[in-house]
Amino acid sequence: MTKTDVQMLKNYIGGQWIEAETSQTEAVYNPATGKIIAEVPLSTKKDVERAVQAAQEAFTTWSKTPVPRRARILFKYQQLLVDKWDELAELVTMENGKSITEAKGEVQRGIECVEFAAGAPTLMMGKQLPDIASGLESGMYRYPIGVIGGITPFNFPMMVPCWMFPLAIACGNTFVLKPSERTPILAARLAELFEEAGLPKGVLNIVNGAHDVVNGLLEHQKVKAISFVGSQPVAEYVYKKGTEHGKRVQALAGAKNHSIVLKDADLDAATKQIIGAAFGSAGERCMAAAVVAVEEEVADDLIQKLVDESNELVIGNGINEEVFLGPVIREEHKERTLQYIQSGIEEGASLIRDGRKDHETNGKGYFVGPTIFDHVTNQMKIWQDEIFAPVLSIVRVSSLAEAIDLSNQSKFANGACLYTDSASSIREFRENIEAGMLGVNIGVPAPMAFFPFSGWKDSFYGDLHANGTDGVEFYTRKKMVTARYM
């Protein structure tokens, strides 16, 4: 790829693509090839100021636009996304690395979020009680809150932005998006299509960059709320700094999801689900299976099945239809993953499938093959830390109660899954596990646009989760009106 093939990205402010107030840029790589595909500006707080000002000006008219009219724009946007499904999926694969099959699934999730947001006339409805007392009635009305800031991660460049700005905008707010500097290309395409659907200028703005943009949004007085998805340390920082400046904040953070396999489980089905959950998207998702707690009686059988299935996975450039496991996002993330693998060995875990030996790991791109450890304990870093890579740790347990207790010792509590044929075990799991997203005989309890999504403990900072009715509550404020008619 020559320099002329590299896309030079701009910011999207007030309906215009404009240069940032800086000459500093960062390279965007195709992680499957290691080649530079774009340069993204490292924008400044001046760029944030311009975007917020544009959003504030647009809010004056957009917030007064009738809700059904806003919904019609969302419906047009949804159809454009459907029409561009394959194109969007290819962009996801190019800048993120996940397989084209998974990318198409991510596009579907994003479209579902827009579909949900298009139901704004219903979502924005208030409530009324006509007879709170003699001659008195009371009602609740919803209103937008103003300019919203969104900070999104690299691992879902389509789905996460689409669960933020379409719903916020449908509720009458305006939006400033800071996409991950590692995957900014898809965000630009989303903005182009929204404009094509008829979105007025300034309602959606994009400011590319890193720390300065994040801090600019967190500190700006006219930004009323921040939605964030990313790592635990940054989520905590965003929450504390945002609330310090008087903002609503929802910050979805890291994870270390446990899958529990009981002796009565269908091991073949469990194996298939765990493989997909652990190694799909190269393990770079907050719902990835990171730890398997398996009852001792079936541990050897399950482990052999996991290794056999892992050996059959096709590793490579995700644009090829037959590929299951693509690269991790960057060279430094690959090196970090290799350090965790070495740490597991040094701390005494049994490395039973070494992804470092897959030939793709030693070629072009940022590949790490499926890696499986046995005899892991909760004292090891590979059990404690979010690795965010195709590394699976197996712990042998004697009972469901022990497995639940083990999972609950993690500081993370995003998700957990149980494989069993027992209704009583399912109930025990549901009532005692400390996590926000639970799966029963499935590997990934994925977020749905119409239900709230997030975790517990250090996996979430805030009060209102993403998606569903929580999302509507987050992006709106309420008025209570009590009236006596004379």
UniProtKB/Swiss-Prot annotation:
Q: Function, please? A: Catalyzes the oxidation of malonate semialdehyde (MSA) and methylmalonate semialdehyde (MMSA) into acetyl-CoA and propanoyl-CoA, respectively. Is involved in a myo-inositol catabolic pathway. Bicarbonate, and not CO2, is the end-product of the enzymatic reaction.
Binding-site list for NAD(+): F154, K178, E181, R182, S231, E386
Q: What is this protein called?
A: Malonate-semialdehyde dehydrogenase
Provide any one GO MF term from the record.
methylmalonate-semialdehyde dehydrogenase (acylating, NAD) activity
GO biological processes: inositol catabolic process; thymine catabolic process; valine catabolic process
Q: What is this enzyme's catalytic activity, as reactions?
A: 3-oxopropanoate + NAD(+) + CoA + H2O = hydrogencarbonate + acetyl-CoA + NADH + H(+); 2-methyl-3-oxopropanoate + NAD(+) + CoA + H2O = propanoyl-CoA + hydrogencarbonate + NADH + H(+)
| Subunit structure, interactors included | Homotetramer.
Q: Where is the active site?
A: C286 (nucleophile)
Which organism is this entry from?
Answer: Bacillus pumilus (strain SAFR-032)
EC number(s) of the enzyme? 1.2.1.27
